[in-house]
Amino acid sequence: MKNLWIWSLPLIVLAFIGWQELANQMPVATSRMTYGRLLEYMQMGWVKRIDVYDRTALIEASSPETGWQWIRVDLPANSSDWLEQAKTLHIDVDVHAVSNWINVASNWIIPLIIIGVVIWLLSRSASSNTTGALNFGKSKARFQMVAKTGIMFDDVAGIEEAKEELAEVVAFLKNPSKFLAVGASIPKGVLLVGPPGTGKTLLAKAIAGEASVPFFSISGSEFVEMFVGVGASRVRDLFKKAKQNAPCLVFIDEIDAVGRQRGAGIGGGNDEREQTLNQLLTEMDGFEGNTGVIVIAATNRVDVLDAALLRPGRFDRQIMVSMPDVKSRIAILKVHANQKKLHPQVSLEAVARRTAGFAGADLANLLNEAAILAVRRGLKQITWKEIDDAIDRVIAGMEGTPIMDGKIKRLIAYHETGHALTATLLPNHPPVQKVTLIPRRQAKGLTWFMQDNERDLLSKSQLMSMIMVALGGRAAEEAVFGNAEVTTGASNDLQQVTNLARQMVTRFGMSSLGPLCLETGNEEIFLGRDMRLMPEVSEEVIAQIDAQVRGMIEACYEKVLELMQANRVVMDRIVEELMEKETLDGKEFRQLVSQAARLTAVN
């Protein structure tokens, strides 16, 4: 800005002087007039005086219409008629010589201003580029001498095993002599692995809050740029700063952005990302070592990381941050419910059992959505109704416009009743939690099931029940409306059924083909894996797999169709109730089923 004033000040002074000079020499005209009109004014005797400045004339005239005024007239080149007429009419004519300095200044002021602005912009751009070039290879890591994340281990719930592992790292940083006395060495790195939303980044913040040592944080994507060598330079700069502040912590979030496996994927070769990874490997455990620097990284794609990055000496510990079970969900809900005003009748245990498959971030979002609904409804406390609606919203999306067409609504009611009734009549399927005709996202209706416990291992009978329940909607449509009226509403169900049946045959060995793993290669070659198109499976075996999958699905469908036809009365009664209320909870649904005179179940 200072240079701009230096360049602009002489030009402003020059322009002001020229303007003053012109203002002193030339009177100010109040209007303009054509040359022909000037001759008319002279014939009428209204012109008193003419001042000529080069090719411009200022006329002192007085007419009955406008009175006395100065009028500007542009004189044609080589015109002398006005001069002859002025002599004849004895009009005063005064010719003024315009200063050459004024002409020169007026011609050069604008070009000089433009040149000055261009020079200033170029100098500013050059300065900026020089600074940017010098800092381009510098690390973008955020540095805190004493981390102030506001999060401690007490604020992290539901992942106690991971907290215990990381508490040892914090204890080592606070009191290394205790460990060194027995010959224990400080771990080089800790890799936090787990699905999205399970609290990996939150754990890193808690470590920073507990350790009271210098803390660097950076995302893996911030290392890689389009320019060659920048990523490796940033890695060197990061570890240089870290070593200067040792002992310290370095947190790399989403390390898979820079740590993907090197190999024979498409494109392969020595690209910029591989150079960055090579530098990271060297800094973590190379010739010089990184004494006093502990690297904590987080990823949800440990399967794509390079093997050299995962070996002991770089990441000594891999801590699995898994999805929370019921007990962990209760602990997480208690942490997030501290700042929420819950109704006394709201049971966090009931919420935890209702939210199987929810990660910690999902549970936090759930309570926040419930709080927003409570405010929207004018309540001062969060009731079970708000939590129930929030769960539905998180799982299935916002409520859509209610279906007004009675025929379509009845068809959807039979479809959802088919799912729920099949699940109720099968002995080894989770009970119905809710059946609704309220549209959400792409679904016109929904059926939820209650997960009583976390099922990590599934039996063949349980998988068969899942297939039959998924086919229940289509079977109900056919049982009531006939095969010709079966709709596209079961497309997603059929996709799930086909995938599950194929896994039972090719992955779980639950078919007449025997206990064999016949999966095709699913390696993602773009992740640096080897290109493998198919395993060593013959075309005959592939045909047998297709036949097994088809036979399994057809057998299940026949059983479910028989079940729907045998329980048509029960189904009609449930549909009528569902059409009236639009939503039935699990208790209401089971009560309607229990009132039936005869139930036919399938073994």
From Swiss-Prot:
Q: What is its main location?
A: plastid
Segments on the Stromal side according to the record's topology features = 1-2, 123-603
- Cited function: Acts as a processive, ATP-dependent zinc metallopeptidase.
Lumenal membrane side: 24-101
Q: What is this protein called?
A: ATP-dependent zinc metalloprotease FtsH
In the record's cofactor note, how is the cofactor described as bound? Binds 1 zinc ion per subunit.
Kindly list the cofactors needed: Zn(2+)
Q: Which UniProt keywords apply?
A: ATP-binding, Chloroplast, Hydrolase, Membrane, Metal-binding, Metalloprotease, Nucleotide-binding, Plastid, Protease, Thylakoid, Transmembrane, Transmembrane helix, Zinc
* One Gene Ontology molecular-function label: ATP-dependent peptidase activity
Q: Which residues form the active site?
A: 416
Q: What family, per the record?
A: In the central section; belongs to the AAA ATPase family.
Residues given in the record as ATP binding sites: 194-201
Quaternary context: Homohexamer.
HAMAP family in UniProt: FtsH
Kindly list the places in or outside the cell where this protein is found, as annotated in its UniProt entry: Plastid, Chloroplast thylakoid membrane
Query: Where is Zn(2+) annotated to bind?
Result: 415, 419, 493
Q: Kindly list the GO CC terms recorded for this protein.
A: chloroplast thylakoid membrane
Q: Which SUPFAM superfamilies match?
A: FtsH protease domain-like (SSF140990), P-loop containing nucleoside triphosphate hydrolases (SSF52540)
Q: Where are the transmembrane segments?
A: 3-23, 102-122
Pfam families documented for this protein:
AAA, AAA_lid_3, FtsH_ext, Peptidase_M41
The Enzyme Commission number assigned here is 3.4.24.-
Membrane-related topology note: Multi-pass membrane protein
Q: Name one GO biological process term.
A: proteolysis
Q: Which organism is it from?
A: Cyanidioschyzon merolae (strain NIES-3377 / 10D)
